[in-house]
């Protein structure tokens, strides 16, 4: 709430933080109106895609699209998180108009991986190919908002003298100081019982200099299952693949406090 995302990034760079990545940009819902075969490439097709304000031509090799499909379209000058292999690229990938085997292409249709997400979070997404929106998706609207991925993500290169900023709370504390605002850390209430973890497990610290303190808790009667979608999206935004509720909770707290955890 202290500043627009771009302004916050600019201020942080002046404070000495290197901005590596920002949010996805210029990605809308488009509907494929016409598909033709590429005259010079058997595995490519030429799509006429309605993006609400105009119809753009996009050349693709995706095997799963057909006329009438509604798909995420990144336009000329827009950015995606990475490639279809699911690996995020620092700074993202800027998409520019170009030619594919001699045919003009004015954008790109996206897989769920290129949008920085995974099939674990969106099981309806195909294993290979472009993400297809449901029929009620509105052409021309933000594809990122429709998918619930419209949170702004900054990736910073933290210098070795600022380990306090390895977690979200550290960055929030820095933002409060930068903008002369009050820092309001979350109030954590520790709930538990009188049982001792030492009654269940034994922890041996072999080198107190490297590990001056090790904390462990025993949690019983846990049902392993998927974590909530909001938590999965937060983790995926930080480059962490959601596993299950127990593992995801520890990773979420680690990202929040900068404290390594394991379950």
Regions flagged by a language model, labelled:
Residues 1-2:
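Short, well-ordered junction/capping motifs at the entry into regular secondary structure
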Residues 5-6, 10-195:
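Phosphate-backbone binding interfaces of nucleic-acid-interacting proteins
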């Amino acid at each position: 709430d202290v500043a627009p995302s771009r302004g916050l990034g600019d201020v942080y760079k002046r404070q000495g933080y290197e901005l590596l990545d920002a949010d996805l940009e210029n990605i809308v819902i488009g509907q494929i109106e016409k598909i033709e075969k590429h005259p010079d490439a058997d595995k490519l097709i030429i799509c006429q895609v309605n993006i609400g304000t105009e119809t753009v031509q996009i050349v693709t090799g995706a095997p799963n699209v057909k006329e009438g499909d509604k798909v995420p379209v990144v336009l000329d000058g827009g950015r995606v998180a990475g490639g279809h292999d699911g690996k995020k690229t620092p700074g993202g990938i800027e998409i520019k108009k170009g030619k594919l085997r001699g045919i003009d292409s004015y954008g790109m249709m996206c897989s769920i991986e290129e949008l920085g997400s995974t099939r674990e979070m969106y099981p309806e997404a195909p294993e290979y190919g472009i993400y297809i929106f449901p029929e009620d998706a509105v052409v021309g609207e933000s594809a990122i908002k429709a998918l619930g991925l419209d949170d702004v993500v900054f990736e910073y290169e933290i210098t070795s003298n600022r380990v306090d900023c390895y977690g979200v709370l550290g960055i929030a504390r820095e933002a409060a100081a930068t903008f002369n605002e009050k820092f309001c850390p979350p109030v954590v209430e520790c709930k538990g019982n009188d049982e001792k973890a030492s009654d269940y497990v034994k922890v041996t610290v072999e080198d107190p200099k490297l590990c001056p303190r090790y904390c462990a808790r025993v949690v019983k009667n846990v049902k392993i299952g998927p974590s909530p979608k909001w938590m999965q999206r937060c983790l995926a935004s930080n480059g962490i693949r959601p596993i299950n509720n127990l593992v995801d909770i520890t990773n979420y707290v680690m990202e929040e406090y900068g404290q390594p955890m394991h379950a």
